[in-house]
């Protein structure tokens, strides 16, 4: 009984911080994420583009792992989707995938790492 009440309290608090205007994020999507960066007194938005290779859903703790290739080196970054540091998320392109996690892309290079694009 006590566990049910505490879960309701947790859900009520979390619901205040969940972003409502998020696009539907799927594995294999190419996304552009705007991250707020504070440098001294200035605040700016830095964009990060890449492919979603993993997604973990847990209400407010939802994370996505985004991978991109920069100067021949693979870079992966994990983003908390509902974080106040995330300014915007835009889906640039969707791809057809048959896996829940695309970790196999880590071993592929060049054209082999391309995903088949889907059109809406």
Curated annotation (Swiss-Prot):
Compartmental location: Plastid, Chloroplast
Keywords: Chloroplast, Plastid, Ribonucleoprotein, Ribosomal protein
Name under which the protein is recorded: Large ribosomal subunit protein bL19c
Lineage, uppermost ranks: Eukaryota, Sar, Stramenopiles, Ochrophyta, Bacillariophyta
Any one GO BP annotation for this protein: translation
Keyword rRNA processing listed: no
InterPro entries: Ribosomal_bL19 (IPR001857), Ribosomal_bL19_CS (IPR018257), Ribosomal_bL19_sf (IPR038657), Translation_prot_SH3-like_sf (IPR008991)
Protein family: Belongs to the bacterial ribosomal protein bL19 family.
CC per GO annotation: chloroplast; mitochondrial large ribosomal subunit
